[in-house]
Amino acid sequence: MGKRGKQRRKDRRGPNKSKAQLPYKSNSAKDFYKFQEQLKQSNLAMQEVKADGNCLFRAIADQLDGNQHNHDMYRQNIVEYIKQCEDDFAPFVEDDVDFETYVKNMKDDAEWGGQIELTACSRLYSVNIVIYHLDAPTYVIKNEAGKGSDTIKLSYHDGEHYNSVRNVCDIDSGEPVCKYKIINPLREKENGDTLRDDDGSGGEWQLSAAQIKLLLEKPS
């Protein structure tokens, strides 16, 4: 995953930039096995995703769609949301890059995502996010919408890789883990039409900049 200067940028974590605040351990084969055993105690297991710089978005896609195919769609939607919410996210972009450049870079395939993208994902898709670490407390991003939000579960490895986390019985099932609710401004009705039905089907929606702008302007 080390192309296009990502070594310099890989630790972007928004309000939690320091490694002490977002801990990780070396991802040797021994540690990977230990991590799996740690998750197994909670009836969980890792659904591994490809380590190609898109791992965060692949893991999100696995949670929401049941597979990794639409990872770029999730990347583009999340980054567009960040762009539309510049006042919220710009303060957490590293000082060596301006916000416009950050957004432009993050739209690129294989650009590493981190804390900013996780927070945007939680807000855009109305989900909580739990991130598991080896021998460390879980890291939780609670959705601001409050009650009723479903939860994305991820594992974080060696400070540079995310995997999807599923119940043991759901590994390789191809079924979505987490149901999200996001209003489609172009289809919205009084009863609240959504991009995804509660049966977990969907995944075909890519939001335009105009749609996300409408979403942000819609009264809650």
Where are these regions (language model features)?
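Deubiquitinase catalytic domains
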Residues: 109, 114-219
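Non-catalytic, low-structured ubiquitin/UBL-interacting segments
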Residues: 1-48, 193-220
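Aromatic-enriched hydrophobic runs in primary sequence
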Residues: 11-16, 20, 31-38, 66, ...
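Papain-like cysteine protease catalytic cores
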Residues: 24-42, 47-143
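Non-transmembrane, interaction-prone segments in cytosolic or luminal domains
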Residues: 4-11, 104, 121, 159, ...
